[in-house]
Amino acid sequence: MRVMVFFKGSEISEMTPTPEMLDAFKAMDVFTEELVKAGVFVAAAGLKPSAESKRVVFEGNKRTVIDGPFAEAREMVAGFSIWEVKDMDEALAWVARCPNTMPDRPGEIEIRPFYEAADLADFVTPEELATPRTGERGKLGVA
């Protein structure tokens, strides 16, 4: 099963990294190498601060662009990783080994499974399920 692991951010993670945070990032690099060696790692990236972001609000056919930063946001994503694991228990076991990139305050990680083709069986035809995806969607196994 594939999961996306969200590394939650905060107003602190939106700031320039401290020396302690940089040390924690080095520990995260070591952890990522462990994921690679175990065949679990698919992809990962850190995200720039919300000050460099945009949000698009959909209202019917209207689209409104809002510039960051998003100080009012209660939850921000600082980074993500995609893993291929046997089950949620394996994902939880890996998260238990993950370094805290914000060692001076509580951190939070959210694990969300991807939809697999079988999860969509009630919504698509058998022919659509049997048709392999091509391009980037095929590489990532996107349902």
Question: Can you describe what each PLM-predicted range is?
Answer:
Residues M1-A143:
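Conserved, structured core segments of small domains
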